Regions:
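Short, Lys/Arg-enriched N-terminal segments with co-localized hydrophobic residues
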Residues: 4, 9-27
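Acidic/proline-rich low-complexity IDRs
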Residues: 6-10, 38-39, 58-61
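Short intrinsically disordered, low-complexity segments
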Residues: 18, 24-27, 40, 130, ...
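Bacterial N-terminal signal peptides that target proteins for export
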Residues: 27-37
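Bacterial N-terminal signal peptides
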Residues: 35-45
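Long, contiguous binding/interaction regions
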Residues: 49-123, 127-132, 136-150, 157-277, ...
Length: 331
């Protein structure tokens, strides 16, 4: 498969060597930059030749476009099925409502990266489809404010065989289409039973599940677990914002849990899978800091159900990610 690539690389190296010996010392830096550009171009083109773009089109159901310079094949489509208004202005998809996935060849197959435009009721279906089919979800956030309906953007990444990656991308797109087919207009709620305005959560069972004493206030219960890290050489932990927390409100039989997980990059995907499996909605994935060690990702969640079931779902995320081993004790 790579014979052509190695041959091209060898020829370029020979040419570069001859070209170098024929130049004066004063222009060696310019020649080096020139030769490097040629070399990278040949490598990129040779790798791109091994990318089965026809198969990507077939599996994604889209017609892509190749960037020969970067060796990247990109498929895209506009989210023009739902009218989006930002600040009172109807926004054309060209202005930032385009879903895309870009493929670049690697020695083991390909890498895909992409951004998926989603409405609120599509988020968890699309995220589950991505994770269930071997893709990583690396961010979930908004690009606008005062947009209606609310628009979210889910970033994905994966490596492996082209067929597997393109097929996984198609699964994500199909998941959003299924949601819109069932309800052409995005929903404005989770559809769960109405919560009581006055909360009455029993703390004891939740304390037992988490193995910690929660903070109680007005019938609500909140648990906060820190994890040690450093930023700019300074130790930071729970009180400085490096924490996972879960807050419960409502009643024992009709409760809501919301909170935030602080996880490393290696922990992110398995914890997301665990919570989605237990019907916990993921509502944001992002960073809170820069230059921290280890790098910490934060994701926010929202769940409805019986309080104990919700607590067990959150604890399940702790167990899958190994977070119980790193959390700092509560006072």
């Amino acid at each position: 498969m790579y014979c052509k690539w190695y041959l091209n690389l060898h020829l370029v190296c020979v040419v570069c060597k001859v070209y170098t010996t024929a130049t004066m010392e004063g222009v060696m830096i310019k020649n080096f930059v020139f030769r490097t550009t040629i070399l990278l171009g040949v490598i990129s083109t040779a790798f791109a030749a091994n990318l089965n773009t026809a198969r990507i089109d077939e599996l994604t159901g889209l017609k892509g476009k190749m960037n020969e310079k970067e060796g990247v094949y990109k498929v895209t489509f506009p989210r023009n099925d739902v009218k989006v208004v930002v600040g009172g202005w109807t926004m054309p998809p060209f202005m930032g409502l385009g879903t895309w996935a870009a493929f670049t060849p690697t020695k083991d197959g390909a890498m895909v990266m992409g951004d998926t435009v989603l409405f609120e009721d599509e988020v968890n279906a699309a995220m589950s489809a991505a994770l269930d089919n071997g893709l990583n979800v690396t961010a979930l956030h908004n690009h606008f404010i005062f947009d209606h309906p609310k628009v979210y953007f889910m970033h994905i990444e994966g490596e492996g065989a082209v067929d597997k990656l393109a097929g996984a991308v198609r699964k994500v797109y199909d998941a959003t289409k299924q949601v819109r087919a069932a309800s052409p207009n995005p929903k404005d709620s989770f559809g769960a039973a109405r919560l009581s305005e006055k909360s009455s959560i029993t703390a004891a069972p939740l304390n037992e599940i988490f193995g910690a004493q929660g903070e109680s206030k007005d019938g609500m219960v909140k648990f906060t677990f820190g994890r040690p890290a450093t930023m700019h050489g300074v130790k930071i932990d729970k009180e400085m914002g490096v924490n996972t927390w879960a807050a419960f409100a409502g009643s024992d039989d009709n409760a809501v849990v919301d909170g935030d997980f602080a996880v490393t990059e290696d922990e992110l995907q398995p914890v997301l899978r665990s919570l989605l499996k237990d019907k916990i909605n993921i509502v944001a994935i992002h960073q809170h800091m820069t230059y921290e060690q280890p790098r910490i990702m934060f994701f926010h969640y929202w769940g409805r159900g019986q309080a104990k079931d919700l607590a067990n779902a959150i604890k399940g995320g702790f167990l899958v990610g190994g977070l119980l081993k790193v959390t700092s004790p509560l006072p």
